[in-house]
């Protein structure tokens, strides 16, 4: 498969990497359009526009750190449960949560703040943070157990689902 990365569960792309099927030279020869490798297959193109990648790493060391963090939420195989760790007791009573969501339904708020107020230690690994910003997906822990979170983001399109957001949520 020429473009097998699109079929994988998670892709971490470094800032220096490009990912494409047909390079800039072929595009120029076939269409006459001049495009750089970065424009065609750089991390911003795939995070912001195509949604192919899930994480952008600044360099290889950051990519390894992101991979370790992601794997810390997942079981070793399909027969095991996700790892359980010591939970954060502060989530049992967080009065600040009530103030985060406005009483006026037409008023926006950042759902990431609500997520941070609910999950252990405020730690949330957002997946595809730059793609389909009207929905937020990712991994966290509540009382030490791994959870997947899918949340509409009221700050973008009032949290309404469009094609990209629906795709992002379904793939997650």
Predicted ranges, named:
Residues 15-17, 87, 144:
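Short hydrophobic/aromatic-rich motifs at helix boundaries and adjacent loops
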Residues 55-116:
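Terminal amphipathic helices with adjacent charged low-complexity linkers/tails
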């Amino acid at each position: 498969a020429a473009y097998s990365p699109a079929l994988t569960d998670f892709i971490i792309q470094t800032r220096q990497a490009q990912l494409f099927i047909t390079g800039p030279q072929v595009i120029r020869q076939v269409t006459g359009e001049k495009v750089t490798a970065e424009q065609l297959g750089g991390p911003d193109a795939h995070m912001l526009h195509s949604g192919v990648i899930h994480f952008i790493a600044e360099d290889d060391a950051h990519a390894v750190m992101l991979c370790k963090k992601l794997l810390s939420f997942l079981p070793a195989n399909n027969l095991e449960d996700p790892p359980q760790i010591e939970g954060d007791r502060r989530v049992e009573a967080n009065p600040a949560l009530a103030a985060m969501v406005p009483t006026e339904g037409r008023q926006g708020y950042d759902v990431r703040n609500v997520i941070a107020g609910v999950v252990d230690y405020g730690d949330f690994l957002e997946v595809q943070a730059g793609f389909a910003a009207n929905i937020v997906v990712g991994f966290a822990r509540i009382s030490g157990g791994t959870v997947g979170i899918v949340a509409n983001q009221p700050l973008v399109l009032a949290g309404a689902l469009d094609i990209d957001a629906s795709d992002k949520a379904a793939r997650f």
